[in-house]
Amino acid sequence: LNGNLIMPGFKDAHTHSAMTFLRSYADDLPLDKWLNEKVFPMEAKLTDNKIYEYSKIAIKEYLTSGITANFDMYISPDPVIQASVDMGFRTVMTGGLNDFTQSVPEIEECYKKYNGYNDLISYELGFHAEYTCSEGLLKDLSALANKLQAPVFCHNSETQKEVAECVKRYGMTPTVYLD
C-alpha cells in the first residue's frame, strides 16, 4: 500500500446511467430544447437491452472513478437495476414518472418489487420534474407516498426558465408548488 490511499467509495447522488450514450449530444442547447428535441425522441427508441448495456458502461465508468454507489433516475428501471445487480453495484433507483412514459401504478409496482429484491438495490418514489407532470399525476403520486410513508424525489428548479414558467402557470416557484 506504499504511496496509496485507502478510503470509502464515493457516492453519486444524481445519475441517469442509461443516458451515457447521450454524453456531449447537442449539449450546446438549453435544457428544455435538449430534452424535448433531442433526448426524449432518442430515449423513445431505446430497447431494454440497450438501456441495460448503456447502464453497464456507466457503472464501469463510475467504478473507475471510485464511485461505489449511485442514486439513479430513469424511465425504464428494470434494465438499469439488472445491470447494477449483474455488476455488483449498489443503486438506489427512482422512476422518472411523467405524463408520457410512466404511471403511478407502475411506480408502485417497482417500489414493491425492488425493495427487498437484492441487498444492493433499493427503490424510491420519484418523478421527472414539475414541468413534465400534470397536477393530477403529482396528486396521485403524493397519495401513494403518503400510503407507503415514502419520500419522493425529483428535479427541481434546474433553470431560470423552468422557475419563470412555473411562476407564470401557478403563481409560485416549483419548490413552493411541489410543497
Residue ranges of model-derived segments:
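Generic detector of well-ordered alpha-helical packing
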Residues: 1, 13-15, 71-73, 156, ...
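Histidine-rich, glycine-flanked metal-binding segment
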Residues: 1-7
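Divalent metal-coordination and catalytic microenvironments
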Residues: 3, 14, 22, 66, ...
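Alpha-helical scaffold segments that flank or form the walls of functional sites
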Residues: 6, 23-88, 108-117
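Flexible loop residues that form catalytic
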Residues: 16, 75, 97
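A general structural signal for well-ordered alpha-helical segments in protein cores
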Residues: 18-19, 32, 175
